[in-house]
Amino acid sequence: MHRPYYCSNRDGKKSDCTGEDSEYLRVGDSELGMPGLENILNERGVDICLWGHKHFYERMFPVYNNQTFYQTLNVYHNAQTPAYIVTGCAGNKEKHALYADYIPPYSAVRSEDYGYMVMNVYNATHMHIRQLNAENGALVDNLWITKSAGYRPGVKSTVATSHRVDKEKLMQINLDSDW
């Protein structure tokens, strides 16, 4: 998809991923009979959603209705909600977008490097995603999305309770994980 509704960049003085246009995409407009994309993606059991528009890389923890569903940093197993990745860092004449000083709880990994994504879908239960630096080939991000056979993600009628974790600790534990 093109325009993300979760990200942590700043456009001017505010993040344009939290503005009115993004909310309209995310939750829809009941008066116009337009459903929000977030409910549709969640109800259909989507595992991952890739976005562009912003000129950087950012991977989110699984998130729904601004509620973060933490997983380990490099493995999302049986995630209840989609994981979102903004991957618009191939480069452009306007240079990179700037990150907000505040890092929202749903933000797992951010990079301003020019780069590209390599995605391997092995079967119905295993997907491996790597983000690489275009200039030197360095690994920027490494994620496995796995699920048990027959598992169907999706938060049904209420948002489940999430818990806060120390993302720095997760990063140390999972940085070298190559599953």
PLM feature spans:
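Metal-dependent phosphoesterase/phosphodiesterase active-site architecture
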Residues: M1-L50, K54-W179
